Amino acid sequence: MYEICYISIPLYNTSTYAFADDDQKAEMLKLAQAAADSVNAAGGETVSDQVSALHEAAQNTLPDIYAVLDGETSDDSASVQTELLTESDVASAFTQDGAADALRSLSYGEAAAVQINSHTLLLMVRVDPLSVSSLDDLRSQILSDMKGGELDDALAAGGAELAHDLDSSAINRLPAKKIVNNSANS
Protein backbone atom coordinates (compact mmCIF):
# COMPACT_ATOMS: atom_id res chain seq x y z
CA MET A 1 0.00 0.00 0.00
CA TYR A 2 1.37 3.36 -1.03
CA GLU A 3 0.11 6.77 0.08
CA ILE A 4 1.37 9.55 -2.15
CA CYS A 5 0.88 13.28 -2.33
CA TYR A 6 1.42 14.36 -5.90
CA ILE A 7 1.08 16.92 -8.63
CA SER A 8 0.24 15.61 -12.06
CA ILE A 9 2.14 17.19 -14.94
CA PRO A 10 0.84 16.51 -18.45
CA LEU A 11 3.47 15.65 -21.03
CA TYR A 12 1.56 17.62 -23.64
CA ASN A 13 0.59 21.23 -24.19
CA THR A 14 -2.79 21.66 -22.51
CA SER A 15 -3.87 24.28 -25.07
CA THR A 16 -2.80 22.65 -28.33
CA TYR A 17 -2.60 19.02 -27.13
CA ALA A 18 0.77 18.68 -28.87
CA PHE A 19 2.66 15.86 -27.16
CA ALA A 20 6.21 16.27 -25.93
CA ASP A 21 8.95 14.55 -27.90
CA ASP A 22 11.62 12.51 -26.10
CA ASP A 23 13.98 15.48 -25.65
CA GLN A 24 11.18 17.63 -24.22
CA LYS A 25 10.11 14.82 -21.88
CA ALA A 26 13.70 14.49 -20.67
CA GLU A 27 13.91 18.25 -20.03
CA MET A 28 10.58 18.26 -18.17
CA LEU A 29 11.65 15.27 -16.08
CA LYS A 30 14.97 16.98 -15.25
CA LEU A 31 13.17 20.12 -14.07
CA ALA A 32 10.64 18.09 -12.06
CA GLN A 33 13.44 16.07 -10.45
CA ALA A 34 15.12 19.33 -9.41
CA ALA A 35 11.84 20.27 -7.71
CA ALA A 36 11.74 16.86 -5.99
CA ASP A 37 15.32 17.41 -4.82
CA SER A 38 14.28 20.73 -3.27
CA VAL A 39 11.42 18.95 -1.46
CA ASN A 40 13.89 16.39 -0.13
CA ALA A 41 16.28 19.16 0.92
CA ALA A 42 13.49 20.87 2.86
CA GLY A 43 13.33 17.74 5.04
CA GLY A 44 9.77 18.12 6.29
CA GLU A 45 9.13 16.20 9.49
CA THR A 46 5.35 16.02 9.18
CA VAL A 47 3.08 15.25 6.24
CA SER A 48 1.90 18.85 6.36
CA ASP A 49 5.50 20.08 6.04
CA GLN A 50 6.14 17.68 3.16
CA VAL A 51 2.98 18.75 1.31
CA SER A 52 3.85 22.42 1.83
CA ALA A 53 7.35 21.83 0.46
CA LEU A 54 5.90 19.94 -2.52
CA HIS A 55 3.42 22.73 -3.24
CA GLU A 56 6.10 25.41 -2.98
CA ALA A 57 8.50 23.49 -5.22
CA ALA A 58 5.74 22.98 -7.78
CA GLN A 59 4.79 26.66 -7.77
CA ASN A 60 8.42 27.59 -8.40
CA THR A 61 9.10 24.95 -11.07
CA LEU A 62 5.86 24.40 -12.99
CA PRO A 63 6.14 27.58 -15.09
CA ASP A 64 9.52 26.37 -16.38
CA ILE A 65 8.21 22.84 -16.96
CA TYR A 66 5.16 24.06 -18.89
CA ALA A 67 7.37 26.48 -20.86
CA VAL A 68 9.21 23.51 -22.39
CA LEU A 69 6.04 22.95 -24.47
CA ASP A 70 5.20 26.67 -24.77
CA GLY A 71 2.35 26.15 -22.32
CA GLU A 72 1.12 28.12 -19.37
CA THR A 73 0.17 26.95 -15.92
CA SER A 74 -3.37 27.26 -14.67
CA ASP A 75 -4.45 28.39 -11.21
CA ASP A 76 -4.78 24.80 -10.02
CA SER A 77 -1.63 23.37 -11.66
CA ALA A 78 0.19 23.23 -8.33
CA SER A 79 -2.71 21.67 -6.42
CA VAL A 80 -1.50 18.72 -4.40
CA GLN A 81 -3.61 15.58 -4.55
CA THR A 82 -3.44 12.58 -2.24
CA GLU A 83 -3.96 8.98 -3.24
CA LEU A 84 -3.82 5.62 -1.47
CA LEU A 85 -2.62 3.07 -4.00
CA THR A 86 -2.76 -0.69 -3.79
CA GLU A 87 -0.23 -2.89 -5.51
CA SER A 88 -2.71 -3.52 -8.34
CA ASP A 89 -3.25 0.25 -8.71
CA VAL A 90 0.49 0.74 -9.04
CA ALA A 91 0.78 -2.05 -11.60
CA SER A 92 -2.05 -0.65 -13.74
CA ALA A 93 -1.25 3.09 -13.49
CA PHE A 94 2.55 3.14 -13.42
CA THR A 95 3.05 1.56 -16.83
CA GLN A 96 6.23 3.33 -17.93
CA ASP A 97 9.34 1.16 -17.57
CA GLY A 98 10.72 1.51 -14.06
CA ALA A 99 7.93 3.80 -12.83
CA ALA A 100 6.40 1.30 -10.40
CA ASP A 101 9.83 0.38 -9.05
CA ALA A 102 10.63 4.06 -8.56
CA LEU A 103 7.55 4.43 -6.36
CA ARG A 104 8.25 1.23 -4.46
CA SER A 105 11.81 2.35 -3.71
CA LEU A 106 10.76 5.65 -2.11
CA SER A 107 10.91 5.81 1.66
CA TYR A 108 8.36 7.79 3.67
CA GLY A 109 8.90 11.51 3.20
CA GLU A 110 11.00 11.08 0.07
CA ALA A 111 10.06 12.96 -3.09
CA ALA A 112 10.69 12.04 -6.72
CA ALA A 113 9.64 12.92 -10.22
CA VAL A 114 8.39 9.87 -12.12
CA GLN A 115 7.01 9.51 -15.62
CA ILE A 116 4.19 7.03 -14.97
CA ASN A 117 3.03 6.60 -18.57
CA SER A 118 3.49 8.16 -22.00
CA HIS A 119 1.49 11.29 -21.18
CA THR A 120 1.88 11.95 -17.43
CA LEU A 121 4.67 12.92 -15.10
CA LEU A 122 4.14 12.94 -11.34
CA LEU A 123 5.98 15.13 -8.89
CA MET A 124 5.28 13.19 -5.71
CA VAL A 125 6.23 12.52 -2.14
CA ARG A 126 5.50 9.19 -0.47
CA VAL A 127 3.94 9.49 2.96
CA ASP A 128 3.13 7.02 5.70
CA PRO A 129 -0.53 5.96 5.26
CA LEU A 130 -0.93 5.86 9.05
CA SER A 131 0.02 9.53 9.29
CA VAL A 132 -2.91 10.42 7.03
CA SER A 133 -5.51 7.83 8.08
CA SER A 134 -6.17 5.74 11.16
CA LEU A 135 -5.58 2.01 11.26
CA ASP A 136 -9.33 1.47 11.46
CA ASP A 137 -9.78 3.47 8.25
CA LEU A 138 -7.14 1.36 6.50
CA ARG A 139 -8.04 -2.02 7.99
CA SER A 140 -10.20 -3.30 5.12
CA GLN A 141 -7.64 -2.20 2.54
CA ILE A 142 -4.79 -3.81 4.45
CA LEU A 143 -6.68 -7.08 4.85
CA SER A 144 -7.66 -7.04 1.20
CA ASP A 145 -4.06 -6.47 0.15
CA MET A 146 -2.74 -9.17 2.47
CA LYS A 147 -5.37 -11.88 2.12
CA GLY A 148 -7.73 -10.92 -0.72
CA GLY A 149 -6.31 -13.46 -3.16
CA GLU A 150 -6.42 -16.26 -0.61
CA LEU A 151 -10.03 -15.44 0.25
CA ASP A 152 -11.04 -15.48 -3.42
CA ASP A 153 -9.32 -18.85 -3.89
CA ALA A 154 -10.96 -20.31 -0.76
CA LEU A 155 -14.43 -19.13 -1.82
CA ALA A 156 -13.96 -20.57 -5.31
CA ALA A 157 -12.76 -23.90 -3.91
CA GLY A 158 -15.64 -24.02 -1.42
CA GLY A 159 -18.15 -23.26 -4.15
CA ALA A 160 -16.71 -25.96 -6.39
CA GLU A 161 -17.15 -28.52 -3.59
CA LEU A 162 -20.85 -27.79 -3.05
CA ALA A 163 -23.32 -30.46 -4.09
CA HIS A 164 -25.42 -29.59 -7.10
CA ASP A 165 -28.63 -31.35 -6.04
CA LEU A 166 -31.95 -29.91 -7.12
CA ASP A 167 -34.85 -30.06 -4.67
CA SER A 168 -37.66 -31.66 -6.70
CA SER A 169 -40.37 -30.65 -4.21
CA ALA A 170 -39.34 -27.00 -4.52
CA ILE A 171 -39.34 -27.29 -8.31
CA ASN A 172 -42.85 -28.79 -8.28
CA ARG A 173 -44.18 -25.96 -6.09
CA LEU A 174 -42.94 -23.28 -8.47
CA PRO A 175 -43.09 -24.48 -12.07
CA ALA A 176 -41.26 -22.42 -14.67
CA LYS A 177 -44.52 -21.13 -16.23
CA LYS A 178 -45.29 -19.26 -12.96
CA ILE A 179 -42.00 -17.33 -13.01
CA VAL A 180 -42.61 -13.81 -14.30
CA ASN A 181 -39.77 -11.68 -15.62
CA ASN A 182 -40.69 -8.19 -14.38
CA SER A 183 -38.06 -6.46 -16.50
CA ALA A 184 -39.66 -7.84 -19.68
CA ASN A 185 -43.13 -6.60 -18.64
CA SER A 186 -42.16 -2.99 -18.04
What are these regions (language model features)?
Residues 1-38, 89-186:
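PPIase-associated folding chaperone regions across multiple families
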Residues 38-96, 137:
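Peptidyl-prolyl cis-trans isomerase
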